[in-house]
């Protein structure tokens, strides 16, 4: 449905050329949700704005539904954009118009018959759960409700593609989850292809089928969510995945940590599990094999793309050589091992 081929984008600032996108290649299959994740300034917004040519690439081709947008005339591009909707971090609603009129706006601009507008808008408001708020003005809506209005308005033209530019960044965590759930529902009910950009791996984990990691204008890793979470190949992808873990040992405990081992001290080790290593009893096997004990302090498990992943933080007791051998054994069994400190 969406194919970006060798996309490059340069800006000129004070006489200097800034490379925003560098040879980007990305395919988003029809009916899937793809998330592009990266830090601020990585090129996410530029990339998504290239899809509907709000930013025209310096080089490369943008193919949407089999049509190369970069070859179209101005009039042809206007027509093609009707099948590509977009929502933003800020909702851009008309404050002087009701919820109903905000959603109806694109239909009125395209001279849609009034009876069709009424039917279509009511259907969309039901879809986003705002039927009872249709006569309310934006100033009386919560942030989540405003984004629901923006989504309904974006769907008014029956698009095939929905672009989401940090659509949940301005929302609280609970509202974010409700908007993500709505996008997932829309994807399933309408078969809509969704491309979203975010700096939060939690967003990708919740609703995406595929993910692309962008860094300094380059896509450095792409694949299904299950593939990336099970076997991240870049350090940045690993960092984003780790950010979904909520690791916070009590301060009273961490204050006892030392960075170097001392006589009779015990290491506090974080073990990260992905893919097959989650279900394998590797800690139990290591304990028996090397004669060491694990006192679990904290653990967490989660799912992404149907794949389990998680971590265990444990105080490890045993002979130093045995602990070292156990660490090597676990690493060889696809467990990431990190010594957080020493106690005792």
Curated annotation (Swiss-Prot):
ATP binds at residues 38-45. It is an enzyme of class 7 (translocase). Its EC number is 7.4.2.11. The keyword Repeat does not apply. Disulfide bonds: none annotated. SMART domains: AAA, NIL. InterPro entries: AAA+_ATPase (IPR003593), ABC_MetN_proteobac (IPR012692), ABC_transporter-like_ATP-bd (IPR003439), ABC_transporter-like_CS (IPR017871), ACT-like_dom_sf (IPR045865), MetN_ABC (IPR041701), MetN_ABC_transporter-like (IPR050086), NIL_domain (IPR018449). Keywords: Amino-acid transport, ATP-binding, Cell inner membrane, Cell membrane, Membrane, Nucleotide-binding, Translocase, Transport. Part of the ABC transporter complex MetNIQ involved in methionine import. Responsible for energy coupling to the transport system. Belongs to the ABC transporter superfamily. Methionine importer (TC 3.A.1.24) family. This is Methionine import ATP-binding protein MetN. It comes from Haemophilus ducreyi (strain 35000HP / ATCC 700724). The gene is metN.
């Amino acid at each position: 449905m969406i194919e970006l081929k060798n996309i490059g984008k340069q800006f000129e600032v004070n006489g200097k050329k800034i490379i925003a996108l560098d040879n980007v290649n990305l395919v988003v299959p029809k009916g899937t949700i793809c998330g592009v994740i990266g830090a601020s300034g990585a090129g996410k917004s530029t990339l998504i704005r290239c899809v509907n040519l709000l930013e025209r690439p310096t080089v490369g081709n943008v193919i949407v539904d089999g049509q190369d947008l970069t070859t179209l005339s101005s009039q042809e591009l206007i027509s093609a954009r009707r099948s590509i909707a977009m929502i933003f971090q800020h909702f851009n609603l008309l404050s002087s118009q009701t919820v109903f009129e905000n959603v109806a706006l694109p239909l009125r601009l395209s001279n849609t018959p009034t009876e069709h507008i009424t039917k279509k808008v009511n259907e969309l408001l039901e879809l986003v759960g705002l039927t009872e708020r249709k006569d309310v003005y934006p100033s009386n809506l919560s942030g989540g409700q405003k984004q629901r209005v923006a989504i309904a308005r974006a769907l008014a033209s029956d698009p095939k593609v929905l672009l989401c530019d940090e659509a949940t960044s301005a929302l609280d965590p609970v509202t974010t989850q409700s908007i993500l759930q709505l996008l997932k529902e829309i994807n399933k009910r309408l078969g809509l292809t969704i491309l979203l950009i975010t700096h939060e791996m939690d967003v990708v984990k919740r609703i995406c089928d595929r993910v692309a990691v962008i860094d300094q204008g380059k896509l450095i890793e792409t694949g299904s969510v299950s593939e990336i979470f099970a076997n991240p190949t870049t350090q940045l992808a690993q960092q984003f995945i780790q950010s979904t873990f909520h690791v916070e040992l009590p301060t009273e405990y961490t204050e006892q940590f030392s960075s170097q081992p001392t006589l009779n001290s015990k290491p506090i080790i974080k073990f990260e599990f992905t893919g097959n290593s989650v279900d394998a009893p590797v800690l139990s096997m290591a304990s028996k094999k090397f004669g060491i004990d694990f006192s679990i302090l904290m653990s967490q498990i989660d799912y992404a793309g149907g794949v389990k992943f998680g971590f265990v933080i444990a105080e490890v007791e045993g002979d130093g050589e045995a602990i070292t051998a156990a660490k090597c054994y676990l690493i060889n069994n696809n467990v990431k091992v990190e010594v957080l400190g020493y106690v005792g």
